[in-house]
């Protein structure tokens, strides 16, 4: 344990907390414009064509966001809303597109977990 004299000379260092979503600037969501919509392949044990898009945010950042759900209507110049949340098997993808907000439509024929995919209740 440090003595009082040692602490006077050099105070204790604070633990640095890493920010996993720096582009959001402490906001819950951010708006952006799609620059490029494309598919990528995941890391080693998995195999698929994951839908992602490159987004230029309102604060000037340019990030890659994952488009969840089956099918989407996004193309270049679509205005979307992104949230934090990484995709474990896609390196460099730390954001998710919010379905059912702005230009991004909700997932068609979704009956369970609708709130995550921007689908209204079926009558």
From Swiss-Prot:
Is Transmembrane set as a keyword in this record? Answer: no
User: Which of the residues bear the PTM 3-methylthioaspartic acid?
Assistant: 89
Give the domain of life: Bacteria
- What are this entry's molecular-function GO terms? rRNA binding; structural constituent of ribosome; tRNA binding
| Gene Ontology biological process terms, A to Z | translation
Cellular component terms (Gene Ontology): small ribosomal subunit
* Keyword field: Methylation, Ribonucleoprotein, Ribosomal protein, RNA-binding, rRNA-binding, tRNA-binding
Which Gene3D superfamilies would you find in this protein's record? Nucleic acid-binding proteins
Query: What does the similarity note say?
Result: Belongs to the universal ribosomal protein uS12 family.
Q: How does it assemble?
A: Part of the 30S ribosomal subunit. Contacts proteins S8 and S17. May interact with IF1 in the 30S initiation complex.
Q: What does this protein do?
A: With S4 and S5 plays an important role in translational accuracy. Interacts with and stabilizes bases of the 16S rRNA that are involved in tRNA selection in the A site and with the mRNA backbone. Located at the interface of the 30S and 50S subunits, it traverses the body of the 30S subunit contacting proteins on the other side and probably holding the rRNA structure together. The combined cluster of proteins S8, S12 and S17 appears to hold together the shoulder and platform of the 30S subunit.
What's this protein's name?
Small ribosomal subunit protein uS12
Read off the lineage from the record. Bacteria, Pseudomonadati, Pseudomonadota, Gammaproteobacteria, Enterobacterales
């Amino acid at each position: 344990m440090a003595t009082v004299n040692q602490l006077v000379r050099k105070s204790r260092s604070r633990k640095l907390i890493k920010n996993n979503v720096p582009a959001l600037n402490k906001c819950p969501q951010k708006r952006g414009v799609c620059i490029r919509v494309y598919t990528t392949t995941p890391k080693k044990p998995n195999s698929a064509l994951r839908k992602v898009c490159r987004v230029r945010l309102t604060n000037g950042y340019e990030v890659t966001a994952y488009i969840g759900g089956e099918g989407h209507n996004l193309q270049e110049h679509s205005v979307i809303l992104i949230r934090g949340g990484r995709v474990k098997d896609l390196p460099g993808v730390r954001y998710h597109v919010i379905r059912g907000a702005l230009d991004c439509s909700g997932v068609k024929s979704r009956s369970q977990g609708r709130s995550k995919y921007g689908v209204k209740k079926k009558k």
